[in-house]
Amino acid sequence: MDEREALSRLASTLPGAGDDCAVVGDRVLTTDMLHGTTDFPAGVDRYTAGWRAVGASLSDVAAMGADAQAAVAAYGAPEFDPAEVHDFLRGAREVCDAVGAEYVGGDLDEHGEFTVATTALGRTDDPVRRGGAEPGDAVCVTGAFGRSAAALRAFERGDPGRGNELFRFTPRVAAGVALRPYATAMMDSSDGLARSLHQLVEASDAPDPGMSIEESAVPVADAVAELFDDPDERREAALFFGEDFELVFTVPDDAMEAARAASPTPVSVVGTVDRDGVRTDGEPLPDRGYGHGGAATDGR
């Protein structure tokens, strides 16, 4: 059983499950687990690991349109190098600082491989969930895609400095808050853009929902062109690799310009909500992306 199937089965037993965060009153709460073998390529330093691990949970808070308040992390490793632990905590604190949250503590434990579990807390009276996309809405994204794929390529080429730089990202908390009054549905792109589009369609309350996506409108990170020569690899990096932590959301067409003006992060319109599945340039868009328990996962 892969991650997707396991989560689907668990969600069926938990009322309200399926969004990027759990909602408890006016608070949103999320937790993530990352492992050395699946989430931190060779060359990732502990500063970047701390930044990225805590940032992943803060990105979930952003996807709900919530103000980020606090985060904690549990750090497991076969042994504790004081310098590595210090660098990890520095990364965790600084990514919190970047979004106006507070890093408030955590735990240390011996573990067979480097493993991190993070939890983040946010606050909003009106969270944006995944299920509100309606036909006619614009399909939008923040930022650009393929940065994490480019980071992996840099690590593979023996350039850890560039790889670590690309692997650190700023969670889109400010954009999420700004977009909250306009977005009908929203999530982050941790599983990849293609998979995120399918997830928004699956969650939609509209009858027989779908999306028509214009592939040329998808913003691609400059590092993708820098590190990938093959056009097919560039497409794979932007659409399917995942772990870019951008926001993927829908907005009524008549609110699009106001939403774009409100966001502190550039917003691109990549398509339209319609019916009959997810398509790009008229062809079905494969439902696959990043997943634990087997890297890229295929939806069937």
Language model region names:
Residues 80, 167-243, 274:
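Active-site-proximal betaalpha loop/short-helix elements
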Residues 82-83, 127-128, 253-261:
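Short, conserved charged micro-motifs
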Residues 31, 129-177:
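Short, acidic (Asp/Glu-rich) active-site segment that either coordinates a divalent metal cofactor
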Residues 88, 135, 256-268:
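Short amphipathic alpha-helices in soluble, non-transmembrane regions
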Residues 260-300:
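Acidic, Ser/Thr/Pro-rich beta/coil linker or hinge segments at domain junctions
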Residues 46-70, 90-101, 172-174, 178, ...:
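Small-aliphatic-rich amphipathic alpha-helix that forms the alpha element of a beta-alpha
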Residues 1-55, 59-62, 101, 285, ...:
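N-terminal glycine-rich phosphate/pyrophosphate-binding loops that anchor nucleotide-derived ligands
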Residues 69-151:
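Glycine-rich anion-binding loops of enzyme active sites
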